Amino acid sequence: MSDNDGLMLMNFTTESGPDNASSHRRVKVTGGKWKERRKLKMKLEGRPLRPKRPAAAVEEAPAAAVPEGSAIEPAAKRPRGRNERAPKDVPPQPANAQVVSSLFTSTRAITTSVNDHERASNDVAPSNAPLLQDTFEALGVRGTLLEHLTGKMKIQKPTKIQKMAIPEVLNGKADLFLHAQTGSGKTLAFLLPVLQTLLSLEQRIDRHSGCFAMIVTPTRELAAQIYGVISTLAQCCHYLVPCLLVGGERKKSEKARLRKGANFIVGTPGRMLDHLQNTKVAREQLPHSLRYLILDEGDKLMELGFEETLKSILEIVHSVACDNTRFPRLPQRIVHVLCSATRQGTVSKLGDIALTDPKVIAASDSTTDVSTVPDQLLQKIAIVPPKLRLVTLCAAISELSRKAPTETTTRTIVFISCADSVDFHYDVFSGLGGSHRDLVPGTVRELAAGSRALPCFSADSPPNTVFYKLHGSLPQAVRVATLRHFSSDAAATRGKHLVLFCTDVASRGLDLPRVSTVIEMDPPFAVEDHLHRIGRTARAGVAGESLLFLLPGEEEGYMEHIRAHHPRGWELLRYDRDLLAPAFAAPVARSDRPTTATDAAWDSNATTWHLNVERRVLEDPSAKDLAIKGYTSHIRAYATHISQEKRFFNVRCLHLGHLAKAFGLRERPKGMAAHRGKPATPKPKQDDARTKMLRMARQAVAQSNSEFNY
């Protein structure tokens, strides 16, 4: 046993003080509430509890002493504690206050002041006009079809693309790629030789003879237009029947028409592939009759993502061998025809897929692949600040309405980037003042006397203006009715100015009669879309105008980007001097109270008109909803420009507040985030294993006791 047995050695410290950390024992307390555990732990460790200061003491605490004569001022007292909540009876302050700003202040400077690509002269020869020295008879169109074409349809001379393409299609020995400007007559270039070939057959044909030609188009509107052209041409041979296959229609009715028989099938890719796969009669007649497969607007077919669908259609068509025993004078193979106004990009890829050793037929004499606009088209460009976009569009439409002749119908197309923005602009121009009547419910409105939509309207004369809207979100029947009304020359439209607000759904292939002006309020998503948009005017040798809106800054560089497509130049307009000042020279009445006409300046009249729109958006919940949807959709659409043009159209360079004013909104852009989508609904909580087992057991017992369980 050692000397230390039974002894305890202890070390004591003689130091004391509050700063000595060893004096506090670390104690672990478990159980109970957090506050109680905290108090008990501090008590056991010997640390004093800090007394809680009342709120009154905080407010009455003296401020820190400030030296006399110092420039530093004492900090202001806080009205309440940091964690103290506001009284419940005080209404919360709005997080998104309204901002009323002037139209003509704080706008971005326009750097382009001189037009370095001025249009030389307006006296130019049309580039897509009919050729006066040639005839259809010399091209091989004869007999009944020639008489109907020149007599009933009043088409006397062929265009350049028709002169070059009709003999090649009649020959039927090679695939063709037709390239020509918009409005040059590509549709008749492939329809006339197909009809002439059928009329020259020795055997009598009718609707039961089979389908001789399939025509694939990217949009329903273009398919309906080609169907109408075939129906008009077939009036001279009533036994030839076309059939239209597009989405939005009843497939049962289309199947019935196919069973009755059709010699021409026109449709969109998806619906046509559906019938080729699921309608037996559509495939049975292919070997004996099908000899022409035509792809119209090939670049748009690829742009809309129809590549795989077209491959499937071609695979089905090519899987059947041609049989010429019934019609020996038909071509020995299927002739493929690809039509497009552009030759670059994805259309060349489609040519590699669909065509075999094609022969390119181009109406242009240029050796380059750059597509150009018609020579007789007068292009105008206006650089407009974002706040002034709406009022400048009003000025442009007002001047067109004021100058429109009352003897003939004038048509104007306004291209906008998205469907929600189309709905907003249609509602503003057709609903401002409330004086209108619906010609087609929801899409066509005729303005009545008393309308304040345009500054050129007077109270003692009818406006003679009809507004339309068209986009892909409308039902198919409504789209067809709207387009038919816009194209008609009936009493409801004769002698009036027809204005169509639309998306790019109306930019491809549509041959709308006498479209005098095209306004691109939103720049196109690609240069090809720009060419097709302005191609709705200046068709078949007729003069036309186009107006393009650009924002100051980066978008001004877009003019250099499209310079090669406008070899004859353009006119550069000033938005204030050339557009706003002439249109708003007349006084504009306020919508909130009756006012007498005064000779105010044009900028005051423009401000009054825009304030009328803002008040309508502020007072009408439905109008405000349209404005917010149009604004947010416009921002999203602006961000979808192709990568090659992002340097001109960068969404980060937009002034969102100024752009919101162009939609009549006074809210800050951040405050409109709640309107961008439907409120999220919480997901239902999933049952655990036990609850799920009990629920299924109860369902089994209830089912066994049911009176229908025999």
Curated annotation (Swiss-Prot):
Q: Where is the composition biased (Polar residues)?
A: 11-21
Cited SMART domains: DEXDc, DUF4217, HELICc
Q: What cellular component GO annotations does this protein have?
A: nucleolus; nucleus
Where do we find the motif DEAD box here? 296-299
Region of interest: Disordered: 1-97, 669-690
Q: What top-tier enzyme class does this entry carry?
A: hydrolase
Q: What positions does the domain Helicase C-terminal occupy?
A: 396-588
Q: What is its EC number?
A: 3.6.4.13
Q: Where in the cell is it found?
A: Nucleus, Nucleolus
Instruction: State where it is primarily located.
Output: nucleus
Q: Which UniProt keywords apply?
A: ATP-binding, Helicase, Hydrolase, Nucleotide-binding, Nucleus, Ribosome biogenesis, RNA-binding, rRNA processing
* Molecular functions per Gene Ontology: ATP binding; ATP hydrolysis activity; RNA binding; RNA helicase activity
Q: Which InterPro entries match?
A: DEAD/DEAH_box_helicase_dom (IPR011545), Helicase_ATP-bd (IPR014001), Helicase_C-like (IPR001650), P-loop_NTPase (IPR027417), RNA_helicase_DEAD_Q_motif (IPR014014), SPB4-like_CTE (IPR025313)
Catalytic activity entry:
ATP + H2O = ADP + phosphate + H(+)
Function recorded in the entry: ATP-binding RNA helicase involved in the biogenesis of 60S ribosomal subunits and is required for the normal formation of 25S and 5.8S rRNAs.
Q: Any additional notes? A: Present with 1460 molecules/cell in log phase SD medium.
Q: Print the domain comment field.
A: The Q motif is unique to and characteristic of the DEAD box family of RNA helicases and controls ATP binding and hydrolysis.
Q: What is this protein called?
A: ATP-dependent RNA helicase DBP7
What gene is this protein translated from?
Answer: DBP7
